[in-house]
């Protein structure tokens, strides 16, 4: 049985997302989109008994106020947004039965930055290029291509769901209220355009997340980069500035160096361009980016490709039924 959720207040930027997002269209310029903190999102779907690909809501910084038309089971994971159900505290990381007519109200994120709401049965919006994920900049996917707006109605595929299920404490991402984050990076693909002392400076320095950051890119503020000789002695086709290079594809998670400004290219980033990418943040570390806030400090730890793959397998191993009690 289908049900509707009425959007009383949309929140700061609440969007429909699904896992793993819109893959297979990178060469056409469509990024994967999908949940920024995939770990928290996947656990929310498991809690309510949804399929892994079921669509849910990503709530950024300040969550929405939603009224449910019918009985359902919901779960809220990720950032702590001090949510209430009809005025009573709503538990995080737990599946909860909601009765028709009840209202879920969220506040500002007090710990972390993004929370995820799963509803039994999953949110029903049209698939675009194989996914329901919202790609804001192109107006693709989600509910009418954009973040939720006050007064809209969200369709849900009604599902039974089981209330009273909790994610085990040691199976959740460790979202803290501190301002310091250790972020893993893989060196490359354009690390040879940076001098060795420049690479060491990057790894040994603190980098501040700027307020001008979103699901397209995370702008960082820190010391100046030191370029290798090849960055200055290159051919004219590569561009004038040492950070310029002949247009090429960008890996998701690459740290794109635009002049002296590093920008981490995340879920909704461009697929190609003419700037170098000396490091790449692996997907298994994206949950840390998703849960950090402007002015937080990053320190980067270099890992190998094999270590990054092992990190991803570790998260995959926690996004399973055995993580529920």
Which residue stretches match the model-derived regions?
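Conserved "landmark" site that anchors the functional core of diverse proteins
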Residues: 1-325
